[in-house]
Amino acid sequence: MGVFAFEDEHPSAVAQAKLFKALTKDSDDIIPKVIEQIQSVEIVEGNGGPGTVKKITASHGGHTSYVLHKIDAIDEASFEYNYSIVGGTGLDESLEKITFESKLLSGPDGGSIGKIKVKFHTKGDVLSDAVREEAKARGTGLFKAVEGYVLANPNY
């Protein structure tokens, strides 16, 4: 089993608190609205706090799959949200899980900066570039889609 990591960051015009709320507390409602492939987000275990497991169902080219998203930690005071993708038909077969440690920092002009550390826990000793790049693209797409929703809905 190997562990492969990368870090990324994304600037946003949206303030920390507002974007954090959209990316965490309200994400179950927002994400299916802004990402066409996501059909549903449902809690299958827990109450929304650490330990909660969500089933995220998506459709890609007529094929439906799902991932299990486990909340590892939420800290509203420091704008930190840690979670893992721990299973499901949408998790690449080469992976045991993917862990995410995210934090929103104060950014320029009232905005924020999203920082994320991603660790791929592989079943073998290799992580393909395709798997890593696809996960990175999906993460960036999700962040930008939720940010776009908040910017388009000023009364959010």
UniProtKB/Swiss-Prot annotation:
<keyword id="KW-0611">Plant defense</keyword>
<dbReference type="GO" id="GO:0010427">
    <property type="term" value="F:abscisic acid binding"/>
</dbReference>
<feature type="binding site">
    <location>
        <position position="38"/>
    </location>
    <ligand>
        <name>Ca(2+)</name>
    </ligand>
</feature>
<dbReference type="GO" id="GO:0044373">
    <property type="term" value="F:cytokinin binding"/>
</dbReference>
<feature type="binding site">
    <location>
        <position position="54"/>
    </location>
    <ligand>
        <name>trans-zeatin 2</name>
    </ligand>
</feature>
<keyword id="KW-0963">Cytoplasm</keyword>
<keyword id="KW-0106">Calcium</keyword>
<dbReference type="GO" id="GO:1904408">
    <property type="term" value="F:melatonin binding"/>
</dbReference>
<keyword id="KW-0020">Allergen</keyword>
<keyword id="KW-0479">Metal-binding</keyword>
<dbReference type="GO" id="GO:0005509">
    <property type="term" value="F:calcium ion binding"/>
</dbReference>
<dbReference type="GO" id="GO:0038023">
    <property type="term" value="F:signaling receptor activity"/>
</dbReference>
<protein>
    <recommendedName>
        <fullName>Protein LlR18B</fullName>
        <ecNumber>3.1.27.-</ecNumber>
    </recommendedName>
</protein>
<dbReference type="GO" id="GO:0009738">
    <property type="term" value="P:abscisic acid-activated signaling pathway"/>
</dbReference>
<dbReference type="InterPro" id="IPR024949">
    <property type="entry name" value="Bet_v_I_allergen"/>
</dbReference>
<keyword id="KW-0568">Pathogenesis-related protein</keyword>
<dbReference type="GO" id="GO:0004864">
    <property type="term" value="F:protein phosphatase inhibitor activity"/>
</dbReference>
<keyword id="KW-0378">Hydrolase</keyword>
<dbReference type="InterPro" id="IPR023393">
    <property type="entry name" value="START-like_dom_sf"/>
</dbReference>
<dbReference type="GO" id="GO:0005829">
    <property type="term" value="C:cytosol"/>
</dbReference>
<feature type="binding site">
    <location>
        <position position="136"/>
    </location>
    <ligand>
        <name>trans-zeatin 3</name>
    </ligand>
</feature>
<dbReference type="Pfam" id="PF00407">
    <property type="entry name" value="Bet_v_1"/>
</dbReference>
<dbReference type="GO" id="GO:0005634">
    <property type="term" value="C:nucleus"/>
</dbReference>
<comment type="function">
    <text>Class II ribonuclease (RNase), with low activity on single-strand RNA. Binds to cytokinins. Interacts with melatonin.</text>
</comment>
<feature type="binding site">
    <location>
        <position position="28"/>
    </location>
    <ligand>
        <name>trans-zeatin 2</name>
    </ligand>
</feature>
<comment type="similarity">
    <text>Belongs to the BetVI family.</text>
</comment>
<dbReference type="InterPro" id="IPR050279">
    <property type="entry name" value="Plant_def-hormone_signal"/>
</dbReference>
<feature type="binding site">
    <location>
        <position position="32"/>
    </location>
    <ligand>
        <name>Ca(2+)</name>
    </ligand>
</feature>
<dbReference type="GO" id="GO:0006952">
    <property type="term" value="P:defense response"/>
</dbReference>
<dbReference type="GO" id="GO:0004540">
    <property type="term" value="F:RNA nuclease activity"/>
</dbReference>
<keyword id="KW-0540">Nuclease</keyword>
<dbReference type="InterPro" id="IPR000916">
    <property type="entry name" value="Bet_v_I/MLP"/>
</dbReference>
<feature type="binding site">
    <location>
        <position position="133"/>
    </location>
    <ligand>
        <name>trans-zeatin 3</name>
    </ligand>
</feature>
<feature type="binding site">
    <location>
        <position position="8"/>
    </location>
    <ligand>
        <name>trans-zeatin 1</name>
    </ligand>
</feature>
